[in-house]
Amino acid sequence: NAIMSDNFPKMLSEYNFFNDPIAQIPTNKVIPYQLMTELFSDYTKKKRFLYVPNNKKAVFEEDSVYQFPLGTALIKTFYYNDDDRKANPVPNLLETRVLLKRKSGWKAASYVWDMEKKDAELKIAGKTIHTSWVNSDGEEKSVRYRVPNVNQCQECHESNKRVIPIGPKARNLNFNIYYSDIEKELNQLQYWFQMGLIDYPIVIDKTAVDWTDHTQSLD
């Protein structure tokens, strides 16, 4: 089991997370998810995925992220579109970060995609990627994108000297997204319940605020 191994596999494909790596189409047991509000990362776009082992569930925490079982994987791919003005832009996959729940705790690593976007290779020491894209205003942008090393990955996720996930809190997931397998939108917590990942979703009054939504109140 690549997730529970003491070492990180050299190639991302060894985890078997994706049926179609280029299109970022996951396998049946890996589900996409989104966060209501997320960290800014040099204008990159992100795709997030979750794997929870069969017959295991995440436990609700009111003031923290879900408590995920051993063998859980949180997967996040960073990319730029070639041209944000296009109806169907071509994604330029940069890296995929994995956060794995092992017996020794959460472990983080980054994988950098090859030129053909067929697979991604483990980069313990990180890497700098020179890349460019065209934004929605038609401006060409370039950046020296920095892939973090393993220590930097763990520093960002450290709390009380323990590595933990940051984003998947109930209030940050409490909104609808489109699911291609059921061909409709559904609240993410409800979908997780239907997939057997959590017990019946606890009704929460608050949803995290989307910082990009200019209609929200400042109060």
Could you describe each region identified by the protein language model?
Residues 1-3, 65, 84-219:
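Sequence context surrounding c-type heme c attachment/ligation sites in exported
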Residues 1-51:
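N-terminal pre-domain segments of enzymes
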Residues 52-57:
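Conserved short histidine dyad/triad with adjacent acidic residue
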Residues 68-71:
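Short, well-ordered loop/turn sites that connect or cap secondary structure elements
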Residues 58-63:
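Short alpha-helix capping/helix-loop boundary micro-motifs
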